[in-house]
From Swiss-Prot:
Active site: 99, 102
Record flagged with keyword Protein biosynthesis: no
Residue intervals passing through the bilayer: none
Localization per Swiss-Prot or TrEMBL: Cytoplasm
GO cellular component, one term: cytoplasm
Phylogenetic placement of the source organism: Bacteria, Bacillati, Bacillota, Bacilli, Bacillales
Record keywords, A-Z: Carbohydrate metabolism, Cytoplasm, Isomerase, Magnesium, Metal-binding, Xylose metabolism
The protein's name: Xylose isomerase
Source organism superkingdom: Bacteria
Subunit structure: Homotetramer.
């Protein structure tokens, strides 16, 4: 065992001072007809939790995990997996996520890498068969190794393109074997630094072909999981092709791929794109493209992807409001693509961080559900757009008018009165619901 001094993390209620207990996340509590566990579908990110060592551009790693001390790739990978499943079980999460290089280091050749992956896939499958934990999604890392300096599916080098395709093929084989509910593409190197040396048209066409081949291969092997694309505007590449939800949806529509994909949206990526997280969620939902989320938060004083654990209750409320309005998760869930801070190097910090994130989204779920149940925000919106329910507004909405009719109407109705947007009232309403939820939270486990 790697976490000998830590037991099962259980729900103890809002008054608990136990740092190894949930205060608000009660997996069995019903909210809006489903349990919290069914709504939230929490997942742990393998890379940040078990691979990361705290290294940053200015300093060496600070996190010396016992499971990463072995030298042989497979020995280390198996120890890491044992630590991971001990963590999953004690935390009580139903899912995990990984990149291929997270579960085992690359070998000296692609063939050796695949041999390692085959052995580790079998090892993980055995562990999953004796556990309640399942695979939410997996993906191929096509951004870390120097071979991807010019991209993977958008590389100017066809040999790199073929190598990346081989990695995705193996990734889909693993997804099929482990019963993944989704498969993710994140194009960290799919973009460009300067147009001076870039054939954008060719790169976008090659990228679309890459996705199409993945869809075809999945169909061939019988993998029926949901394909997801994770937008990000920049970092590590200056201009990334999957900039945000709208850009990614436009790309998929342009190349006839929209029916095969949904989006995996990350809060910190929305920040980098100049959007709120709820904006990205709303855009995806409007196009029936909301698949899953990576839960984290950024630091507005910094300009990069800090991947902090989500503790902002207000943001979690607004995110869950959009998710519930869209019908909730189907194959997706809430993956904590978040890392403990570099000075938080103790193993127990991993538990504290996930407990905080899970409690945050539990509060977000309860408040959002109550807002929707009470239709607390609906009245203001209905009043604001009331002019489109009758007269000329209804004609506009139903497409029964034209510029000439509208011009004639405007000439006869040029005394215009607008109504208040009531932003402050709405924000106060959200605050009230949030504070009430915290006030009403059961003090102890026995209270329901």
């Amino acid at each position: 065992m790697f976490f000998r001094n830590i037991g099962m993390i259980e729900y103890e209620g809002a008054d608990s001072e136990n740092p190894y207990a949930f205060k608000y996340y009660n997996p069995d509590e019903f909210v809006g007809g489903k349990t919290m566990k069914e709504h939230l579908r929490f997942a742990v990110a393998y890379w940040h939790t078990f691979d990361a060592d705290g290294k940053d551009p200015f300093g060496d790693g600070t996190m010396f995990r016992a499971w990463n001390r072995l030298t042989h790739p497979l020995d280390k990978a198996k120890a890491r997996a044992e630590a991971a499943f001990e963590f999953f079980e004690k935390l009580g999460v139903p899912y995990f996520c990984f990149h291929d290089v997270d579960i085992v280091d690359e070998g000296a050749t692609l063939r050796e890498t695949f041999t390692y992956l085959d052995q580790m896939s079998s090892f993980l499958k055995e562990m999953m068969e004796t556990s309640h934990v399942q695979l939410l999604w997996n993906t191929a890392n096509m951004f870390t190794h120097p071979r991807y300096v010019h991209g993977a599916a958008t590389s100017c080098n066809a040999d790199v393109y073929a190598y990346a395709a081989a990695k995705v093929k193996k990734g889909l084989d693993i997804a099929k074997e482990l019963g993944a509910e989704n498969y993710v593409f994140w194009g960290g190197r799919e973009g460009y630094e300067t147009l001076l040396n870039t054939d954008m048209k060719l790169e976008l066409e090659n990228l679309s072909s890459f996705y199409r081949m993945a869809v075809e291969y999945a169909r061939e092997i019988g993998f029926d999981g949901q394909f997801l694309i994770e937008p990000k505007p920049k970092e590590p590449t200056k201009h990334q092709y999957d900039f945000d939800a709208a850009t990614t949806i436009a790309f998929l529509e342009t190349y006839g791929l929209k029916d095969h994909f949904k989006l995996n949206l990350e809060a910190n990526h929305a920040t980098l794109a100049g959007h709120t997280f709820e904006h990205e969620l709303r855009v995806a939902a409007l196009h029936d493209m909301l698949g899953s989320i990576d839960a984290n938060q950024g630091d507005l004083l910094l300009g990069w992807d800090t991947d902090e654990f989500p503790t902002d209750l207000y943001s979690a409320v607004l995110a869950m409001y959009e998710i519930l309005k869209a019908g909730g998760f189907k194959t997706g869930g809430i993956n904590f693509d978040a890392k403990v801070r570099r000075p938080s190097f103790a193993d127990e910090d991993l538990f504290h961080a996930h407990i905080a994130g899970m409690d945050t989204y539990a509060v977000g779920l309860k408040v959002a559900s109550r807002l929707l149940e009470d239709k607390a925000l609906d009245q203001v919106i209905e009043e604001r757009y009331e002019s489109y329910t009758k007269g000329i507004g209804l004609e506009i909405k139903e497409g029964r008018t034209d510029l000439k009719k509208l011009a004639a109407y405007a000439l006869e109705n040029d005394h215009i009165e607008n109504q208040s947007g009531r932003q402050e009232r709405l924000k106060a309403t959200v605050n009230r619901y949030l504070l009430n939820a915290l006030r009403e939270a059961p003090a102890g486990k026995e209270t329901h």
